[in-house]
């Protein structure tokens, strides 16, 4: 299995001969190394509806025929208003099996909406974190979130091999809370900081996060770099 980071919260997972992308913010992402014209995916998984996560989902889904997995509200919105054919709606606590592995959505403390060109926001369900089980490994993508103690329950129920955690502050956890979440609650084998440096408001030094973490290994990935099992 291979996990690649592509700026902000975009993760590309390759496992069981399938390709999965999380939060495909590609075209307008100054930190993303991917090209929307050449990306190949079988599944798209969404944590919530903000533009820097919802991103290129419509174009990518139509171009590739990928199945979009997200909240029931996002699935309905994509199907009804954008003509995306392959959607799979879920909600917090739900788990579903796919041919690459399983997806379980868990709690995240954030917000979730998508703003139309007319400026009107559309509610797209609750924000969510994702627990993947692929090739015998557990990956926890926290999504955009603040710190909450039930991260420890998530990790107790699903011992984490790799955790993708936001460190950008302002809109999500910063370095202090993110490192606390890793050290005290999640305790993964590998931590990867995400959701930073894309915009001035979330500029951070990931080395400070690495220095603050005292469990497992911290991998600071540049866009396009990966961890592999």
From Swiss-Prot:
It holds the Pfam family Lactamase_B_2. Gene3D superfamilies: Ribonuclease Z/Hydroxyacylglutathione hydrolase-like. InterPro entries: Metallo-B-lactamas, RibonucZ/Hydroxyglut_hydro, UPF0173, UPF0173_UPF0282_UlaG_hydrolase. GO terms for molecular function: hydrolase activity. It comes from the Bacteria. Keywords: Hydrolase. The keyword Glycosyltransferase does not apply. NCBIfam families: PRK00685.1. Belongs to the UPF0173 family. HAMAP family: UPF0173 (MF_00457). This is UPF0173 metal-dependent hydrolase SAOUHSC_01815.
């Amino acid at each position: 299995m291979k996990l690649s980071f592509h700026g902000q919260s975009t993760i590309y997972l390759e496992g069981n001969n399938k390709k999965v992308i999380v939060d495909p913010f590609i075209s307008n992402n100054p930190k993303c190394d991917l090209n929307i014209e050449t990306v190949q995916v079988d599944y798209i998984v969404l944590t919530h509806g903000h533009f820097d996560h919802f991103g290129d989902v419509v174009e990518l889904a139509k171009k590739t025929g990928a199945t979009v997995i997200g909240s029931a509200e996002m699935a309905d919105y994509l199907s009804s208003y954008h003509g995306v054919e392959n959607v799979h709606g879920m909600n917090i606590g739900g788990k579903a099996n796919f041919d690459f592995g399983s997806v379980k959505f868990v709690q995240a403390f954030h917000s979730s909406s998508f703003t139309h060109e007319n400026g009107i926001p559309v509610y797209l369900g609750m924000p969510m974190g994702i627990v993947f089980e692929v090739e015998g490994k557990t990956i926890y993508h926290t999504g955009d979130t603040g710190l909450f103690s039930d991260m420890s329950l998530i990790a107790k129920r699903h011992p984490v091999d790799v955790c993708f955690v936001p460190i950008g502050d302002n809109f999500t956890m910063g370095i202090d809370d993110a490192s606390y979440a890793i050290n005290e609650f999640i305790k993964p084998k590998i931590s990867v900081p995400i959701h930073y440096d894309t915009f001035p408001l979330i500029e951070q030094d990931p080395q400070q996060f690495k220095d603050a973490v005292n469990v497992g290994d911290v991998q600071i990935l540049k866009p396009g770099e990966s961890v592999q099992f």
